Design a protein with these regions (language model features):
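C-terminal catalytic domain of photolyase/cryptochrome flavoproteins
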Residues: 1-241
Length: 241
């Protein structure tokens, strides 16, 4: 899950300008660097978020597509499954690895963000604003516009959102992007034991009230992925707009 520019926090803090990144990306593209095209597309996506936040500021804290206001998402941020999602204890390795990395480092790869957002809003049928608020508390590259658009893209309530029937399977995604389980083992002590300082650092970073230790067994999944997908699709298909 490497291969990012690592500039997201610099952009969010104003330490580097989008136009400077754009010019550097164009130069790299002209020099034949294939990844430059992806970089430029992501930069445009970021600026699109700011465009939307300026012209339709409701995207920052409300459904951009207002017909989603009556969708039956869970809105209880104290829900047990929500807390397990926050703690990286869902029993779904890709989700948990990404959430623990987030808590320790304040960072998360874009692929991880898509997976954990899809899982929360679709498999757990939880309102995207709960996830957005947790990201706001944890990310060092927190960007109101980009994150609001990203969460609403995953949930289906935003502009140019992912189709409602696109529900990421975290286990399939793990096999595709982390086939050797290097990322999983880097962040989940239950799989790596005491061989990963990164995984163990999570238990030093978390609040004591969570009462989690590296010796604990890895939890069972909070939801069956197949059943969760079917339930989400049924809810999306039967939504009343």
């Amino acid at each position: 899950l490497d291969g990012t520019s690592g500039l997201s926090e610099n952009l969010s803090l104003g330490e580097i300008s989008p136009i400077e990144c754009w010019n550097a990306g164009l130069k790299a593209l002209e020099e034949g660097h294939d990844a430059a095209e992806i970089f430029l597309k992501e930069l445009v996506w970021r600026e699109f978020a700011y465009h939307l936040a300026h012209h339709t500021p409701r995207i920052l804290d409300n459904n951009w597509r207002q017909e989603w206001n009556n969708f039956p998402w869970n809105t209880n941020d104290k829900d047990e499954k929500v807390i397990l999602w926050q703690q990286g204890r869902t029993g779904i390795p890709f989700v948990d690895a990404a959430m623990r990395e987030l808590y320790v480092t304040g960072r998360m790869h874009n692929r991880g963000r898509m997976i954990v957002a899809s899982f929360l809003t679709k498999h757990l049928m939880t309102h995207w604003k709960i996830g957005l608020k947790w990201f706001e508390n944890c990310l060092i590259d927190w960007d109101p516009a980009s994150n609001a658009m990203g969460w609403q893209w995953s949930a289906g309530s935003g502009p140019d959102a992912t189709p409602y029937f696109r529900v990421f399977n975290p286990n399939t995604q793990l096999e595709k992007f982390d086939g050797k389980y290097e990322y999983r083992n880097r962040w989940l002590a239950e799989f790596s034991g005491k061989n990963s300082k990164n995984a163990l650092s999570f238990f030093d970073a978390i609040p004591k009230k969570w009462k989690l230790t590296p010796e604990m067994e890895y939890p069972a999944p909070v939801v069956d992925l197949s059943q969760g997908r079917v339930a989400a699709l049924d809810a999306y298909k039967n939504r009343e707009f």
